[in-house]
């Protein structure tokens, strides 16, 4: 049986990376592909998460013996020596979920101005930019220059690179990765059998924001936009992060109109009866699983035109797209859907159709099998 080994820091759902690993592992196993998991740190739901894999072990234990898997896929590994060790153990691909491998600031936008970056990695320039972050144990000369450059060298030496969007493919080409080494594999999104239409299910209507509560996700921009609105609403915020306390203080003038629910490893229930999901991202979102997940539930989107959002937010069809950082335009777009539940429902239905056409199990499996046929001798033998 062909085998693949997923390697990531966490055993357990912390964000979209782990949710992607979990769902993809289940689909690949059903297709007859063995999937193992290696990790550095267990989370409270590690046992549930690891049940999606055939076998699991720590990274330290995995590197003590040869692997019988045909391909190793690194999802979140931030240590150069560890990347090298897995790379030297056999065919290795890197799944680029975000900007952390080529931006020592990790966010791929500039400090102070918070304008998005478009440059290729340069050890000196990017290291200096990273030093402008707030003081922390990680914000050191060694981490920003020497260690980061070593990590990027090891990552670039891997055999293949996997991304979720054409947007990220373009960024990797800009970073000097050969086009032939990059594979775009769209995620598979579950389509629920029934949805609650984003119409007058609640009064006032509910909006939803899901994701880590960090600056790059832009929830502060969403709160700024909400303060400009006159239409009643309730914003449900699902997620946690290091900006949570600041966001709660910022939301105080909005009173009961903003509710923080904390983290949810399976947020499907949060989509029920929601008028719109808002994607107020500041950073260039590499994909944003929450977008097509919302559409799968028949919920339209409102978001800033950054990153890979155009892969699923078709302006006027599956939601409303506004210029990056324009909180006044964001407020107007949200109010448009709050005022017109029929339009919101139509956009949600179109989004559900788009997801069912584009983000399918079969498309995901074709992508992974194509990758295996390139890198895995065992897969070549077992594929008709």
What kind of region is each of these model predictions?
Residues 300-303:
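Short hydrophobic beta-strand element within catalytic cores of glycosyltransferases
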């Amino acid at each position: 049986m062909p085998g693949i080994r997923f390697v990531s820091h966490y055993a357990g759902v912390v964000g979209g990376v782990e949710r992607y690993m979990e769902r993809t592992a289940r689909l690949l196993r059903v297709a007859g592909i063995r999937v193992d998991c290696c990790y550095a740190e267990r989370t409270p739901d590690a046992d549930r998460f690891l049940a999606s894999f055939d076998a699991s072990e720590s990274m330290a234990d995995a590197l003590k013996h040869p692997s019988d898997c045909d391909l190793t896929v690194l999802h979140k590994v931030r240590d150069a020596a560890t990347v090298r060790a897995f790379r030297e153990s056999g065919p290795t691909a890197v799944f680029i979920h975000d900007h952390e491998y080529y931006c020592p600031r990790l966010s791929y936008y500039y400090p102070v101005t918070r304008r998005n970056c478009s440059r290729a990695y340069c050890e000196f320039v990017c290291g200096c930019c990273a030093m402008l972050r707030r003081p922390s144990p990680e914000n050191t000369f060694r981490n920003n220059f020497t260690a980061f450059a070593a990590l990027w060298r090891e990552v670039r030496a891997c055999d293949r690179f996997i991304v979720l969007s054409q947007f990220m493919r373009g960024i990797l080409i800009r970073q000097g990765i050969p086009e032939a080494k990059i594979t775009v594999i769209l995620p598979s999104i579950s389509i629920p059998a029934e949805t609650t239409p984003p119409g007058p299910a609640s009064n006032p209507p509910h909006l939803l924001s899901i994701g880590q509560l960090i600056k790059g996700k832009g929830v502060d921009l969403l709160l700024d936009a909400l303060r400009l609105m006159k239409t009643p609403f309730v914003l449900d915020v699902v997620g946690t992060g290091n900006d949570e306390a600041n966001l709660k203080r910022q939301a105080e003038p909005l009173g009961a109109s903003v509710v923080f629910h904390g983290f949810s490893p399976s947020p499907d229930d949060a989509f029920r009866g929601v008028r719109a999901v808002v994607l107020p991202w500041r950073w260039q979102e590499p994909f944003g699983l929450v977008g097509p997940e919302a559409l799968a539930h028949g919920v339209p989107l409102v978001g800033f035109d950054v990153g890979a959002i155009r892969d699923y937010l078709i302006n006027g069809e599956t939601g409303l797209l506004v210029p990056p950082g324009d909180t006044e335009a964001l407020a107007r777009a949200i109010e448009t859907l709050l005022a017109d539940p029929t339009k919101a429902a139509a956009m949600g239905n179109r989004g559900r159709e788009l997801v069912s056409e584009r983000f399918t199990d079969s498309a995901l499996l074709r992508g992974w099998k194509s990758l295996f046929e390139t890198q895995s001798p065992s897969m070549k033998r077992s594929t008709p």
